[in-house]
């Protein structure tokens, strides 16, 4: 499942570049696939694993519609290939994290990101067997049955594509020993809120991967402003998020508008600082810190 998401991301990455190449030279598609496979699967210890990874990547690019293992295997030799690929995805010993990091690093080298975007990923399911399936009343989706996750998107001027994701596991799964055992949920995985899941998804990427530290756009409901924003502040990562109109903030930088205004809403701070607004583009600097020009240093009041 994790590999499926990675393949979808790679498909987005390859799309425009490869479509242009294929229009002129059909054989460039496979050459580009091999080139990207060498980058993505370099962490695989065995040659046969790297080869299967390349075949899976090529099959996912050729498959139209739903990219299930069965549909992908149809381009690789039918039922025998399906069984082999199913084992490779579900039961092999390779680690998926280096694959995701390799994708994000490769993209960053091609074109540095402007931001990392966290976005909800609802996955409708009819049955009960998929890990994390639950039925909830969602304020946006209404009554929803399925899995809930958060994706982390690489966002540049020319391309937006997912590079990682984190599955939300409800308490009904984590407190059920039978479900935990059947789904092979690690012992160290504990309960978290949807908000915590969204934050952890992107901080795990920026805290452990070799990717540029860019501002985070957090497209998720933020209810615990002090806790959530505090995590980004401690990590030194600017964040853009929606907050309620009753939440109050304090401007910390004495040189910025609103510093002497006490506790203000986000809208009041934005109005006071409207003279500082400017269109942001990529710079030559390797990182974006909390003290960057044009960045408001604010913190929620407690």
Residue ranges and their predicted role:
Residues 2-87:
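Gly/serine-rich nucleotide phosphate-binding loop at the start of the catalytic core
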Residues 48-49, 60, 64-128, 240, ...:
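Electropositive nucleic-acid engagement tracts
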Residues 57-58, 88-91, 214-221:
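Conserved short loop/turn motifs at secondary-structure junctions
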Residues 64, 99, 144, 220-224, ...:
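Short, glycine/acidic-rich beta->alpha junctions
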Residues 83-87, 140-212:
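Electropositive, glycine- and tryptophan-enriched low-complexity nucleic-acid-binding patches
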Residues 89, 93-171, 283-286, 290, ...:
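Active-site-proximal, Lys/Arg-enriched surface segment
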Residues 125-127, 160-161, 171-176, 223-227, ...:
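Short, well-ordered, mixed-charge alpha-helical segments that flank or form enzyme active sites
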Residues 186-302:
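An internal, acidic/charged active-site-proximal segment
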């Amino acid at each position: 499942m994790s590999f499926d998401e990675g393949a979808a991301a790679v498909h987005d990455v390859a799309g425009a570049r490869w479509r242009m190449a294929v229009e002129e030279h059909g054989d460039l598609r496979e050459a580009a696939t091999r080139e990207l496979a060498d980058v993505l699967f370099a962490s695989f210890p065995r040659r046969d694993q790297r080869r299967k990874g390349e075949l899976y990547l090529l099959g996912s690019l050729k498959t139209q519609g739903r990219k299930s293992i069965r549909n992908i295997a149809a381009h690789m030799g039918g039922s025998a290939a399906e069984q082999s690929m199913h084992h490779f995805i579900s039961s092999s010993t390779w680690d998926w994290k280096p694959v995701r990091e390799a994708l994000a690093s490769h993209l960053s080298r091609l074109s540095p990101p402007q931001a990392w975007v966290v976005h909800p990923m609802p996955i409708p399911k009819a049955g009960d067997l998929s890990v994390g399936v639950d039925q909830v009343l969602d304020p946006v989706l209404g009554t929803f049955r399925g899995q809930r996750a958060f994706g982390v998107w690489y966002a540049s001027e020319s391309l937006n594509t997912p590079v990682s994701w984190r599955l939300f596991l409800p308490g009904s799964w984590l407190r059920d020993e039978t479900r935990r055992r059947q789904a092979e949920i690690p012992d160290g995985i504990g309960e978290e809120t949807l908000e915590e899941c969204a934050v952890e998804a992107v901080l795990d990427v920026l805290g452990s991967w070799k990717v540029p530290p860019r501002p985070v756009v957090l497209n998720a409901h933020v209810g615990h402003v002090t806790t959530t924003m505090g995590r980004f502040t401690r990590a030194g990562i600017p964040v853009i998020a929606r907050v309620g109109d009753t939440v109050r903030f304090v401007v910390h930088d004495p040189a910025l508008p609103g510093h002497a205004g006490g506790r203000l809403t986000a809208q009041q701070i934005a109005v006071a600082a409207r003279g500082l607004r400017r269109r942001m583009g990529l710079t030559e600097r390797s990182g974006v810190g909390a003290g960057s020009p044009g960045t408001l240093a604010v913190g929620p009041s407690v």
